[in-house]
Amino acid sequence: MTSTDGILAGKYPAKAHARRVVEYLRQNGFQGDGVLYLEAQKTRMIEDNDSEQPFRQRRFFFYLSGCLLPDAHLTYHISTDKLTLFIPPLDPESVIWSGLPLSPAQAKELYDVDEVLYTTDVNPTLAHLASKVGFVFAIDGQISDDVSLKSFPDTDKVALKTAIEECRAVKDAYEVAMIRKANDVTSQAHVAVLKAAKSATNERELEAAFIGTCIAQGCREMAYHPIVASGTSSATLHYVNNDEPLIDSSTNKKKLNLLLDAAGEYKAYCADVTRTFPLSGKFSPESREIYDIVLEMQTESLAMLKEGVLWEDVHITAHRVAIKGLLKLGILRGSEEELLEKRVSVAFFPHGLGHYLGMDTHDTGGHANYADKDKMFQYLRVRGKLPAGSVITVEPGVYFCRFIIEPYLKDSELSKYIDADVLEKYWEVGGVRIEDNIHITKEGHENLTTAPKTADQVELMINGS
């Protein structure tokens, strides 16, 4: 048994999370006793159909329960430190179709809670708690019509959501183990795609190889819709068609590269991994040049990562590496400082360096500022210093997207910084992105992603070595 498996053999630390949330509320002015109230996602039916929609648990509820059941509820009484889970009672009509549901006794063994009751006990329990305490925290829009909080003198429907969002930014050992597990499975799936690349003829075959491996290894859900982008489609950041042939019809040869941004989700926790590789098994000279720049962008960014580092500084470092590399190739002209000041590198690296990762792919607590007038930082999803315990993606890229770059070429001020003749050789490269998931520690960082990454490793894997 690995250390990850050993950690995950225990219960999800729901009560510790409840205590952390209360501590945050107290640090932000709440005093006295109170109750936290949360609801799971409801079972919903597909419109005009008798089948259920795919289920995705509410993350706020899961953080304080570890429970993936639909239609459940929870209460946490602050002064008694009592966490109660409410699960749906047995419905005889559904047993013939779905089997027996989890019993309260089974749920008590499975989850880190003090008591398990049926959902028919929600309102009586809330009324009893209201007779003892005056304050209940809930989330606006996540309170069922048949649930009454009116007996509480005071109700706050804002602070709890904020508190959980902020607490989620720092992961405990169990959460990191969940993300590591998702990464282990995801890395295996990336390897499966590398091995299938030479014989595949369409993007969808590689998507199938990825998803099939994830399911077989324990990640039944994808963290997000896979991006399987061949050829110049790799210049589109969130390409999702995944249905194009891998052969270029104009040359009858395989397209240069494939960008695979795909990851599994393990029990509500996500990975987020990107690799770019040559479909032929060998990078073209231009592709290899860009790949090496992007890998260096990531390498220098990773070297900076530790508790307290300013994420904006890491992002700027990645841009500096991109500028140096593109200057060396002759794509850019001018001085490094002038190119940085004019934000010319944003034409080739238009997105943020990364984002927090956890129960959501773009996890909470990043404090993005999409209204920032500085286009270098406008799409940076994390602002400020990185705390120990956070998990963040590091995903630099260089893209040759005509829609983004051509306005620079037409701009009388900015066009002088880009050599259009040299650039012409690189349009076919499309885009290169490399993405790993990094756990920030007090001493530095830990890379949770193990998928092959260097150009030589990738080529060897595709060619069966």
Curated annotation (Swiss-Prot):
Mn(2+) 2 binds at D261, D272, E435. It catalyses: Release of any N-terminal amino acid, including proline, that is linked to proline, even from a dipeptide or tripeptide. Signal peptide: none annotated. Mn(2+) 1 binds at D272, E395, E435. GO terms for molecular function: manganese ion binding; metalloaminopeptidase activity. It is an enzyme of class 3 (hydrolase). Binds 2 manganese ions per subunit. It comes from the Eukaryota. Pfam families: AMP_N, Peptidase_M24. One of its GO terms (biological process) is proteolysis. InterPro entries: Aminopep_P_N (IPR007865), Creatin/AminoP/Spt16_N (IPR029149), Creatinase/aminopeptidase-like (IPR036005), Pept_M24 (IPR000994), X-Pro_dipept-like (IPR052433). CDD domains: Prolidase. Its EC number is 3.4.11.9. Its cofactor is Mn(2+). Keywords: Aminopeptidase, Hydrolase, Manganese, Metal-binding, Metalloprotease, Protease. PANTHER family: XAA-PRO AMINOPEPTIDASE 3, XAA-PRO DIPEPTIDASE. Catalyzes the removal of a penultimate prolyl residue from the N-termini of peptides. Belongs to the peptidase M24B family. This is Probable Xaa-Pro aminopeptidase pepP.
